[in-house]
Amino acid sequence: MSNSQLKIKTKALPNSRIAIEFEVPAQQCKTSFEDALTTLCKSANLPGFRKGKVPKSVILQQIGSKRIQASALEKLLEKIWKQALKEESIEPLCEPELAGGFEPLLENFNPEQTLSVTLETDVAPIPKLKTTKGLTTEAEPITFDESKVDELIEESRKQLATVIPVENRPANHSDIAILTFKGTFADDGSEIEGGSGESMEIDLEEGRMIPGFIEGIVGMKINETKTIDCQFPKDYQDEKAKGRKAKFDIQLQDLKTRELPKLDDDFAKQASDKNSLKELRNELTNRLKSDAKNRNKKNRQESLLEALVKELEVDLPKTLIDEEVRNLIEQTARNFAEQGMDIKSTFTQDLVSSLMESSRPEAEINLKKNLALNALAEAENIKVDSQALEEKIKEVNIELANQKNIDQKKLRQVVQNDLLQEKLFDWLEANNTILEKKPKKALNEKVKSSKPKNTQKKTDKTKKDSP
C-alpha cells in the first residue's frame, strides 16, 4: 500500500512482466469525472451558448455521460500510472496494457464507486548465472594454411588474365564455355524453373554448378550438342528441385580460355601496391596469419559464451525480443540494399512476417548472450579501468581524426563496451577450460590479397546460371 488513498500493489508475471493492481477511491474517480466535465464545458461550442459558458447539465444532455466517463477514465489511468511508476520505482520497457481492455472497464465504470483496475507492462529482466567458473567447453582451432597464399595469388592471376578463343580442341576444366541449354526434370519431363539459358558464359570449374553439369561439358567440342544427366543435391535451396534427377540439352557454341600473366615481379606490381612477388607473398602470409589468429580467438570466445549461456537463468520480455527481431530484419534489409536490391519490392508483408517468425530464435540467443555477459560483470565485479578507457578513447580519436561530427558520448560508450567485453572474455578464459575440438576443415575463408589495378580482360560480359 503506497498511501491512504490510492492503493497500489505489484505482482510478478512470467516473461519479465509485472501487473500493477490499483484500487482507486470513489472520491478520486468522482474528481476525475468532474474535471472531465468542466473541461468539456470550457471547450464546447453549442448553439445559443458562448464558448466556455455551457452549463454542465446541457453538456450531459448533449454529449452524454459515457463520453465524459471515457475521458475521465483515460485521464485517471494516465495519472495513476505515473504515480505508480514514481512510488514503486518501476522502469517499464513498454507502454502499459490494460488487463481486460478499455471497453469492459468503461462499461462498469461508476464515478461514485471505488475502481479496481490492473495495468501490465514489461520490465528489464534480472539475469542470474548458476555458475561462472569451472566450465568445460570445446572450440575448433584455426591454423594458418600456407597453401592458401598460393590460392590467393592464383585468384589474382585469373582476375588479370586475358581471355582468348580456343580452337581445335575440346573443352577442359578451367575453360569458359558459351552455352545454350534447357533443363527438365527426369521424372516428369517438366521444365526446370531458371534451368535454361541462351549464349551464357559459364566457368568450367568443379563445384560451380550442380553435380554432373560441368563434368558433362568437359570433352565437348564447339557446336556439339549433348544431353547431360545431373542430380540436384538433397540440400538444394529450391524445394521443388531437391534430390531430383534432371536432364540438360546443351549446345556448346563457343569456348575460351584464360592466358594467365607470368608469376613474377611485374605481376605483383599489377596485382597490388607491392614491388616484388616476394613482398606480395609476405603481405598475404601476414594477412592470413592474422585472420587465422582472429578467427581462432573468436571461436574460443563463442565457445565460452555458449557455455556461459547454458548457466543463465532469465525470463526474456516480449518487448526486448520484438526489438531485437526488428534489428535483425533491418540488418537484413541493409544487406540487401548493399547488394543493389530494391527493398520496397523485396520486403513484402509476407516476407516480413516470415522473417519475424524465423528471426525469433536468433533474437533470443543474442539477448541471452548479452544478458549472460552483463550478469558475469555483475557477479564477478568486472569493470573497465578509467585510465585505460581514457587512453583508448584518445587512441580512437587519433584514428578518426579525419572524420567530422563524432559523437563523443556514443564513442565513449562503444569503447567502454568493447573494453569491458575484452575483460570479460579474458576472465572467462582464465577461469574455465577450453578443449580442442577436431577441426572440420582448414581455414578456407578467402582474404582479398589486393586491389587489382586491371580487371579481367574479357570479350563478353560474364553471366551466371542458376543450376
From Swiss-Prot:
The keyword Cell cycle applies. Residues 174-261 form the PPIase FKBP-type domain. One of its GO terms (cellular component) is cytoplasm. It catalyses: [protein]-peptidylproline (omega=180) = [protein]-peptidylproline (omega=0). PROSITE patterns: FKBP_PPIASE. It comes from the Bacteria. Keywords: Cell cycle, Cell division, Chaperone, Cytoplasm, Isomerase, Rotamase. GO terms for molecular function: peptidyl-prolyl cis-trans isomerase activity; protein folding chaperone; ribosome binding. HAMAP family: Trigger_factor_Tig. Consists of 3 domains; the N-terminus binds the ribosome, the middle domain has PPIase activity, while the C-terminus has intrinsic chaperone activity on its own. NCBIfam families: tig (TIGR00115). This is Trigger factor. The gene is tig.
